[in-house]
């Protein structure tokens, strides 16, 4: 049986080091344990790496880089950017949050099974999920299921 392909946006590795929200921190850590145990085929994109490299806290940045080191990194292709722009044009994601649109687009273009996020403002939202599915269907793309880590781990 093939492993599920998962895409992690930047919130997931970030929560591994966020002790202010212990339940989410525990779930993010557990997800990374599952990844290390190779229960999933785990991906991030070059957009996630860029966000990590732009972290202001150097110690945190170094920890994040180390954490995602073994994950496969997807290229943010022109097709990904085009689909992200479509989400923005249709007011699904605000322009100032283009990286959020890129995360969703990469998961769609690369036919990922699950996009895992704690971004409740722009990604893990019924309105976003429904609108992304509609646009992807219209344009012939498969939609990744957008979920939180708790949905794929044993809590």
Show which residues each predicted segment covers.
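Short, well-structured N-terminal submotif of metal-dependent ribonuclease cores
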Residues: 1-44, 53-65, 71, 89-95, ...
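A structural signal for short, well-ordered beta-strand segments and their strand-loop junctions
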Residues: 7-8, 43-45, 115-117, 148
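Residues at the C-termini of beta-strands that transition into short coil/loop
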Residues: 46, 77, 150
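Active-site neighborhoods of divalent-metal-dependent phosphate/nucleic-acid chemistry enzymes
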Residues: 73-130, 153
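C-terminal end-helix/capping segment
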Residues: 124-145
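Short, C-terminally biased terminal segments at protein or domain edges
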Residues: 141-155
